[in-house]
Amino acid sequence: MSFLPSFILSDESKERISKILTLTHNVAHYGWIPFVLYLGWAHTSNRPNFLNLLSPLPSV
């Protein structure tokens, strides 16, 4: 397996890569449903006001 390049990373680089991967995992995990809801809201013909969507009171 001498044809595969070997990357020698410092401990600091490994820690940064680990933090970046953890951050992207959290963004994808917690941002998926709001993203899908936004896409559904953005592509409707009768788009309600965004503040009305966040209000717990029914809109008139």
Swiss-Prot record:
Extract one GO BP annotation from the record: protein import into mitochondrial matrix
| Misc | Present with 3250 molecules/cell in log phase SD medium.
Parts of the chain on the Cytoplasmic side: 2-19
Q: Which Pfam families match?
A: Tom7
Q: Which residues lie on this side of the membrane: Mitochondrial intermembrane?
A: 42-60
According to its UniProt record, where is this protein mainly located?
mitochondrion
Q: What's the protein's topology in the membrane? A: Single-pass membrane protein
**Out of the domains of life, which is the source?**
Eukaryota
Tell me what this protein is called.
Mitochondrial import receptor subunit TOM7
**Where is this chain's protein located in or outside the cell?**
Mitochondrion outer membrane
Q: Does the keyword Ribosomal protein apply?
A: no
| Protein task | Component of the TOM (translocase of outer membrane) receptor complex responsible for the recognition and translocation of cytosolically synthesized mitochondrial preproteins. TOM7 is involved in assembly and stability of the TOM complex.
Give the record's family classification. Belongs to the Tom7 family.
Keyword annotations from UniProtKB, A to Z: Membrane, Mitochondrion, Mitochondrion outer membrane, Protein transport, Transmembrane, Transmembrane helix, Transport
Segments traversing the membrane: 20-41
Listed under GO cellular component are: mitochondrial outer membrane; mitochondrial outer membrane translocase complex; mitochondrion
Subunit field text: Forms part of the preprotein translocase complex of the outer mitochondrial membrane (TOM complex) which consists of at least 7 different proteins (TOM5, TOM6, TOM7, TOM20, TOM22, TOM40 and TOM70).
Record organism: Saccharomyces cerevisiae (strain ATCC 204508 / S288c)
